[in-house]
Amino acid sequence: MLVVSIGGSPSLRSRSGVLLERSRQWLQDRGVEVVTFQVRDFPAEDLLHARFDSPHVQHFQQLVAQADGLIVSTPVYKASFSGALKTLLDLLPERALAHKIVLPIATGGSIAHMLAVDYALKPVLSALKAQETLQGIFADDSQVAYAEGTKPAQLVQALEERLHDSLETFHVALARRPRPVAPGVLNERLISARWSI
Protein backbone atom coordinates (compact mmCIF):
# COMPACT_ATOMS: atom_id res chain seq x y z
CA MET A 1 0.00 0.00 0.00
CA LEU A 2 1.41 3.40 -0.99
CA VAL A 3 0.25 6.75 0.37
CA VAL A 4 1.51 10.10 -0.88
CA SER A 5 1.30 12.84 1.73
CA ILE A 6 1.38 16.46 0.61
CA GLY A 7 2.30 19.32 2.91
CA GLY A 8 0.81 22.60 1.72
CA SER A 9 2.61 24.97 4.07
CA PRO A 10 5.43 27.08 2.64
CA SER A 11 6.85 27.45 6.19
CA LEU A 12 9.34 25.06 7.75
CA ARG A 13 7.45 25.23 11.04
CA SER A 14 3.74 24.62 10.62
CA ARG A 15 0.94 23.02 12.57
CA SER A 16 -0.39 21.34 9.43
CA GLY A 17 3.09 19.84 9.06
CA VAL A 18 2.91 18.47 12.61
CA LEU A 19 -0.37 16.69 11.78
CA LEU A 20 1.07 15.38 8.51
CA GLU A 21 4.10 13.96 10.33
CA ARG A 22 1.89 12.30 12.97
CA SER A 23 -0.18 10.76 10.18
CA ARG A 24 2.95 9.46 8.42
CA GLN A 25 4.17 7.81 11.63
CA TRP A 26 0.77 6.24 12.34
CA LEU A 27 0.51 4.74 8.84
CA GLN A 28 4.12 3.52 8.76
CA ASP A 29 3.57 1.79 12.10
CA ARG A 30 0.88 -0.23 10.29
CA GLY A 31 3.10 -1.20 7.37
CA VAL A 32 1.97 1.46 4.89
CA GLU A 33 4.63 3.00 2.66
CA VAL A 34 4.37 6.80 2.87
CA VAL A 35 6.17 9.27 0.59
CA THR A 36 5.95 12.91 1.65
CA PHE A 37 6.14 15.98 -0.57
CA GLN A 38 6.26 19.52 0.83
CA VAL A 39 5.39 22.44 -1.45
CA ARG A 40 8.45 24.29 -0.12
CA ASP A 41 10.72 21.52 -1.51
CA PHE A 42 9.74 22.27 -5.11
CA PRO A 43 11.63 24.99 -6.99
CA ALA A 44 9.40 28.08 -6.97
CA GLU A 45 9.83 28.46 -10.74
CA ASP A 46 8.39 24.98 -11.31
CA LEU A 47 5.24 25.92 -9.43
CA LEU A 48 4.82 29.51 -10.63
CA HIS A 49 5.53 28.74 -14.28
CA ALA A 50 3.69 25.39 -14.30
CA ARG A 51 6.73 23.46 -15.52
CA PHE A 52 5.20 20.09 -16.30
CA ASP A 53 8.55 18.97 -17.74
CA SER A 54 10.44 19.56 -14.48
CA PRO A 55 12.03 16.37 -13.07
CA HIS A 56 10.66 17.27 -9.60
CA VAL A 57 7.13 17.66 -10.95
CA GLN A 58 7.33 14.50 -13.06
CA HIS A 59 8.55 12.48 -10.06
CA PHE A 60 5.64 13.87 -8.02
CA GLN A 61 3.14 13.00 -10.78
CA GLN A 62 4.49 9.44 -11.09
CA LEU A 63 4.20 8.74 -7.37
CA VAL A 64 0.70 10.19 -7.21
CA ALA A 65 -0.25 7.93 -10.14
CA GLN A 66 1.08 4.87 -8.25
CA ALA A 67 -0.48 5.81 -4.90
CA ASP A 68 -3.49 4.10 -3.35
CA GLY A 69 -4.33 7.21 -1.38
CA LEU A 70 -3.27 10.73 -0.49
CA ILE A 71 -3.17 12.84 2.64
CA VAL A 72 -3.32 16.54 1.85
CA SER A 73 -2.46 18.86 4.74
CA THR A 74 -2.69 22.64 4.56
CA PRO A 75 -2.87 25.75 6.65
CA VAL A 76 -5.93 27.92 6.03
CA TYR A 77 -5.20 31.50 5.01
CA LYS A 78 -7.99 34.03 4.42
CA ALA A 79 -10.72 31.37 4.29
CA SER A 80 -8.93 29.12 1.78
CA PHE A 81 -6.15 26.56 1.61
CA SER A 82 -2.61 27.66 0.78
CA GLY A 83 -1.93 29.13 -2.65
CA ALA A 84 1.32 27.16 -2.85
CA LEU A 85 -0.67 23.94 -2.49
CA LYS A 86 -3.04 25.06 -5.27
CA THR A 87 -0.12 25.64 -7.64
CA LEU A 88 1.15 22.12 -6.90
CA LEU A 89 -2.26 20.48 -7.36
CA ASP A 90 -2.61 22.37 -10.66
CA LEU A 91 0.38 20.39 -11.95
CA LEU A 92 -1.50 17.10 -11.67
CA PRO A 93 -3.28 15.66 -14.73
CA GLU A 94 -7.07 16.01 -14.94
CA ARG A 95 -7.93 12.55 -13.55
CA ALA A 96 -4.90 12.22 -11.28
CA LEU A 97 -6.90 11.18 -8.22
CA ALA A 98 -9.20 8.67 -9.92
CA HIS A 99 -9.33 5.41 -7.92
CA LYS A 100 -7.71 7.10 -4.91
CA ILE A 101 -8.83 7.76 -1.34
CA VAL A 102 -8.00 11.24 -0.03
CA LEU A 103 -7.82 12.44 3.57
CA PRO A 104 -7.73 16.26 3.88
CA ILE A 105 -6.19 17.89 6.96
CA ALA A 106 -6.30 21.62 7.69
CA THR A 107 -5.20 23.97 10.44
CA GLY A 108 -6.24 27.56 11.03
CA GLY A 109 -6.19 30.38 13.52
CA SER A 110 -9.70 29.66 14.76
CA ILE A 111 -12.67 27.35 14.32
CA ALA A 112 -14.11 29.96 11.92
CA HIS A 113 -11.77 28.59 9.23
CA MET A 114 -13.09 25.04 9.51
CA LEU A 115 -15.37 25.23 6.46
CA ALA A 116 -12.42 26.01 4.16
CA VAL A 117 -11.87 22.25 3.76
CA ASP A 118 -15.42 21.69 2.48
CA TYR A 119 -15.79 24.85 0.39
CA ALA A 120 -12.27 25.36 -0.97
CA LEU A 121 -10.14 22.19 -0.84
CA LYS A 122 -12.68 19.42 -1.46
CA PRO A 123 -13.95 20.93 -4.77
CA VAL A 124 -10.37 20.91 -6.11
CA LEU A 125 -9.89 17.28 -5.04
CA SER A 126 -13.22 16.44 -6.67
CA ALA A 127 -12.15 18.14 -9.90
CA LEU A 128 -9.13 15.81 -9.91
CA LYS A 129 -11.66 12.93 -9.71
CA ALA A 130 -10.80 11.60 -6.25
CA GLN A 131 -12.67 8.32 -5.81
CA GLU A 132 -13.48 9.16 -2.20
CA THR A 133 -12.63 12.23 -0.15
CA LEU A 134 -13.02 11.50 3.54
CA GLN A 135 -14.49 13.86 6.13
CA GLY A 136 -11.08 15.23 7.05
CA ILE A 137 -9.69 16.92 10.12
CA PHE A 138 -9.52 20.56 11.14
CA ALA A 139 -7.44 21.81 14.06
CA ASP A 140 -7.23 25.35 15.34
CA ASP A 141 -3.87 26.72 16.41
CA SER A 142 -4.55 26.24 20.12
CA GLN A 143 -4.78 22.45 19.64
CA VAL A 144 -1.22 21.96 18.32
CA ALA A 145 1.94 22.90 20.24
CA TYR A 146 5.24 22.98 18.36
CA ALA A 147 8.20 20.86 19.41
CA GLU A 148 10.59 22.67 21.75
CA GLY A 149 14.11 21.40 22.31
CA THR A 150 13.85 17.69 23.02
CA LYS A 151 10.12 17.90 23.74
CA PRO A 152 8.11 16.65 20.73
CA ALA A 153 5.13 18.50 19.28
CA GLN A 154 1.96 18.04 21.31
CA LEU A 155 -1.69 17.68 20.29
CA VAL A 156 -4.59 18.15 22.68
CA GLN A 157 -6.17 14.80 23.47
CA ALA A 158 -9.42 15.45 21.58
CA LEU A 159 -7.45 16.25 18.40
CA GLU A 160 -5.20 13.21 18.88
CA GLU A 161 -8.30 11.00 19.11
CA ARG A 162 -9.93 12.61 16.04
CA LEU A 163 -6.72 12.19 14.07
CA HIS A 164 -6.42 8.49 15.00
CA ASP A 165 -10.10 7.88 14.16
CA SER A 166 -9.70 9.55 10.76
CA LEU A 167 -6.51 7.63 10.03
CA GLU A 168 -8.22 4.37 10.96
CA THR A 169 -11.08 5.20 8.56
CA PHE A 170 -8.51 6.10 5.87
CA HIS A 171 -6.59 2.85 6.42
CA VAL A 172 -9.78 0.76 6.18
CA ALA A 173 -10.86 2.64 3.04
CA LEU A 174 -7.48 1.94 1.43
CA ALA A 175 -7.78 -1.77 2.21
CA ARG A 176 -11.26 -2.07 0.65
CA ARG A 177 -10.43 0.07 -2.38
CA PRO A 178 -11.15 -1.80 -5.62
CA ARG A 179 -8.07 -2.21 -7.76
CA PRO A 180 -8.43 -0.79 -11.27
CA VAL A 181 -7.97 -3.33 -14.05
CA ALA A 182 -5.19 -2.53 -16.52
CA PRO A 183 -6.56 -1.73 -20.00
CA GLY A 184 -4.70 -4.68 -21.61
CA VAL A 185 -6.07 -7.15 -19.04
CA LEU A 186 -9.57 -5.74 -19.42
CA ASN A 187 -9.38 -6.10 -23.20
CA GLU A 188 -8.27 -9.75 -22.87
CA ARG A 189 -11.11 -10.49 -20.49
CA LEU A 190 -13.66 -8.94 -22.84
CA ILE A 191 -12.36 -10.98 -25.79
CA SER A 192 -12.42 -14.18 -23.70
CA ALA A 193 -15.94 -13.41 -22.53
CA ARG A 194 -17.16 -13.07 -26.13
CA TRP A 195 -15.72 -16.47 -27.03
CA SER A 196 -17.33 -18.13 -24.05
CA ILE A 197 -20.85 -16.92 -24.82
Swiss-Prot record:
InterPro entries, A to Z: Flavoprotein-like_sf, FMN_Rdtase-like_dom, NAD(P)H-dep_FMN_reductase, NADPH-dep_FMN_reduc_SsuE
One Pfam match: FMN_red
Its EC number(s): 1.5.1.38
UniProt KW NADP keyword: yes
UniProt entry keywords in alphabetical sequence: Flavoprotein, FMN, NADP, Oxidoreductase
Enzyme class: oxidoreductase
One GO term of the biological process aspect: alkanesulfonate catabolic process
Catalysed reactions, semicolon-separated: FMNH2 + NADP(+) = FMN + NADPH + 2 H(+)
Oxidoreductase listed as a keyword: yes
GO molecular function, one term: FMN reductase (NADPH) activity
Function (record text): Probably forms a two-component reduced flavin mononucleotide-dependent monooxygenase by binding to SsuD. Required for growth on aliphatic sulfonates or methionine but not arylsulfonates.
Family statement: Belongs to the SsuE family.
Entry protein name: FMN reductase (NADPH)
Taxonomic lineage from the root: Bacteria, Pseudomonadati, Pseudomonadota, Gammaproteobacteria, Pseudomonadales
This protein's encoding gene: ssuE
